[in-house]
Amino acid sequence: MLVGCGLGRSPGCDGLVRRLLDLPRPLVLDADGINALSGHMDALSRRRDRITVLTPHEGEFVRAGGDLSPGRERAAADFAREHGVYLVLKGPGTIAAAPDGRCMRNPTGNCGMAKGGSGDVLAGMLVSLLGLGLPPMDACCAAVWLHGRAGDLAARQVGLWGMTPSDLLDRIPAALREVTE
């Protein structure tokens, strides 16, 4: 289940997100799904035995209680371990971190992807890969790499400043072909 894309900050959203934490299925929290837990990160402890993935950008990460001072990789690894979640810290060199301490920095992607909706594409890819049964860290790494590669293809074809999240979607098949053929 994916929660947060376009959710908004209206009254009741925070309580809704906290109630969804009790569901048994894998849960991906993005954007306002993460913001809804700000100040309530202890609620994640109820999900330690279930797959939970957070996909914040740096601002959402800090609002959720993350500390970037030790550097992005260390910060992501520490947060994932402390809260028992998988974390995809978006930004230059997106980081995927697992609760067991594993951490990966992604080499694909570019600054043209830093716009509203790009993270929604990533979150959708991630929840789709989890739905296919990929192990969580593999799903995180694959989604992040494919998302970044689709962004690199879009930048080459339409330019960094003109690319949109739809351009990412259009290039996912080409990115997939690069690793499957």
Residue ranges of model-derived segments:
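Glycine-rich phosphate/dinucleotide-binding loop and adjoining beta-alpha-beta core of small-molecule
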Residues: M1-T108, R177
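Gly/Ser/Thr-rich beta-alpha loop segments that engage phosphate groups in nucleotides
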Residues: G6-S10, G93, C111, S118-L122, ...
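Short, small-residue alpha-helix embedded
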Residues: R63, K115-L146
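Feature representing long, continuous alpha-helical segments
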Residues: R74-A77, M104, A123-G124, M137, ...
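Charged C-terminal helix
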Residues: R149-E181
